[in-house]
From Swiss-Prot:
GO terms, molecular function: glutamate-1-semialdehyde 2,1-aminomutase activity; pyridoxal phosphate binding; transaminase activity
N6-(pyridoxal phosphate)lysine: residues bearing it: K265
Listed InterPro entries: 4pyrrol_synth_GluAld_NH2Trfase (IPR004639), Aminotrans_3 (IPR005814), Aminotrans_3_PPA_site (IPR049704), PyrdxlP-dep_Trfase (IPR015424), PyrdxlP-dep_Trfase_major (IPR015421), PyrdxlP-dep_Trfase_small (IPR015422)
PROSITE patterns: AA_TRANSFER_CLASS_3
Metabolic or biological pathway: Porphyrin-containing compound metabolism; protoporphyrin-IX biosynthesis; 5-aminolevulinate from L-glutamyl-tRNA(Glu): step 2/2
Keyword match GTP-binding: no
Assembly with partners or alone: Homodimer.
Gene3D superfamilies: Aspartate Aminotransferase, domain 1, Type I PLP-dependent aspartate aminotransferase-like (Major domain)
Protein name: Glutamate-1-semialdehyde 2,1-aminomutase
Location in the cell: Cytoplasm
EC number: 5.4.3.8
Length: 426
């Protein structure tokens, strides 16, 4: 790992922490982050030439795998015509049409450049539409680095938000209510106390930033019911789950239609992207047709649109997602079987092509408190053992894993063989 070490030393002199996103730093698992230079299919190669089976997939976007030939061809073809124009382009219309065709809640959509932009803009729009200020979010859910959503809960099941990091003023999060995820009773209590003041509820329909925790039966239904009852808007943050848990996203999988949806990751096929959309009457409140302002220099970038459209064609093709979900199940069940054989307590969750590994015997894992109580040291040992074996998992116990269409039988078997050896070392 000589070249990786050298690059990280250089990076730490020039970039805070040596990384451009904190989770990449390996702070949660220990050691130094690995620098990668190439990917193909389900594999990545680091700068020292070692190959890994990849279950991070760029934190979700690469549902077709690395350097898919058709996606690369479409990107190259589009880039040759110009990287950006700052004007409307045909590809953004095609992307908007594609999203509205596949995502049940979308009648109109606005394209942006990141998931954070999508959630930030959706909140502003919800407040503008309802004329209310309070936002409900859930413990363990992450919605980007939006000040109003970097709130943490205080003591008790239901509290007003307090800042979750330095630099976030108390006044900014004062209108943020934080409720335990998957706690139906707490949701009811929240709306009984504050329902007439709540502009919106924002939720990851499958929590992917407390590892991978699907909704318990009745949870999403309760959110829809209380929002309908109080005229609050329901916002699904599907930046991670969009086209990852089903070809119609989480809302199609679970049969609950939100008022607004935030998207990202897969929609850009590996390029920077975000999107938010919903009912026409709400979306027409955005400038220039309405008074809620939102803008972006590179929004609807043609190269991003090309990559995203090519990716969406792959994942929405007949039978594609079903095959991907079956592959994911083979990976998850295979790892669980090998943990059981080694006498290692391991709980697993899966939602489509997302999965979670929890070093605990407290199953099923449905609550953030359970996630925090897992054996983090065991996860860290397993992570490094798998890394040694050539399998790249998310370098944090609180992050979901991802499988791609490119993960074939060889990649799966290589992973399971590595897991068997790794559990012997844990």
């Amino acid at each position: 790992m000589q070249r990786t070490h050298q690059l990280f030393q250089q990076a730490r002199e020039l970039i805070p922490g040596g990384v451009n996103s904190p989770v990449r730093a390996f702070k949660g698992v220990g050691g130094e982050p690995i620098f990668f230079e190439r990917g193909e299919g389900p594999y990545m190669w680091d700068v020292d030439g070692k190959r890994y089976v990849d279950y991070v997939c760029s934190w979700g976007p690469l549902v077709a795998g690395h350097a898919d030939p058709e996606i690369v061809r479409r990107v190259q073809e589009t880039a040759a015509k110009g990287l950006s124009f700052g004007t409307p382009v045909e590809l953004e219309v095609e992307m908007a049409r594609t999203l509205c065709q596949h995502v049940p809640s979308l009648e109109m959509v606005r394209l942006v450049n990141s998931g954070t932009e999508a959630t930030m803009s959706a909140l502003r729009l919800a407040r503008g539409f309802t004329g209310r200020d309070k936002i409900v979010k859930f413990q363990g859910n992450y919605h980007g680095h939006v000040d109003a959503l970097l709130a943490q809960a205080g003591s008790g099941a239901l509290t007003l938000g307090v800042p979750g990091c330095p630099g976030v003023p108390e006044a900014v999060v004062a209108e943020t209510l934080t409720v335990p995820y998957n706690d139906i009773e707490a949701v009811e209590q929240c709306f009984n106390e504050h329902g007439s003041e709540i502009a919106a509820v924002i939720v990851e329909p499958v929590a992917g930033n407390m590892n991978c925790v699907p909704p318990v039966p009745g949870f999403l239904e309760k959110l829809r019911e209380v929002c309908d009852r109080t005229d609050a808007l329901l916002i699904f943050d599907e930046v991670m789950t969009g086209f990852r848990v089903g070809p119609q996203c989480a809302q199609g999988r679970y049969g609950i239609t939100p008022d607004l949806t935030c998207l990202g990751k897969v929609v850009g096929g590996g390029m920077p992207v975000g999107a938010f959309g919903g009912r026409r009457e709400i979306m027409e409140g955005l400038a220039p047709t309405g008074g809620v302002y939102q803008a972006g220099t590179l929004s609807g970038n043609p190269v991003t649109m090309a990559a995203g459209l090519a990716t969406l064609e792959r994942i929405t093709a007949p039978g594609a997602f079903e095959g991907l979900e079956q592959t994911t199940t083979r990976v998850v069940d295979g790892i669980k079987e090998r943990a059981d054989a080694a006498g290692i307590p391991l709980a697993t969750n899966q939602a489509g092509s997302m999965f979670g590994l929890f070093f605990t015997d407290d199953a099923p894992v449905t609550r953030f408190e359970q996630v925090k109580a897992c054996d983090l040291d065991a996860f860290n040992r397993f992570f490094h053992a798998m890394l040694d074996e050539g399998v790249y998992l998310a370098p944090a116990a609180f992050e979901a894993g991802f499988v791609s269409l490119a993960h074939d039988d060889n990649a799966v078997q290589e992973t399971l063989d590595a897991a068997e050896r790794a559990f012997a070392r844990v």
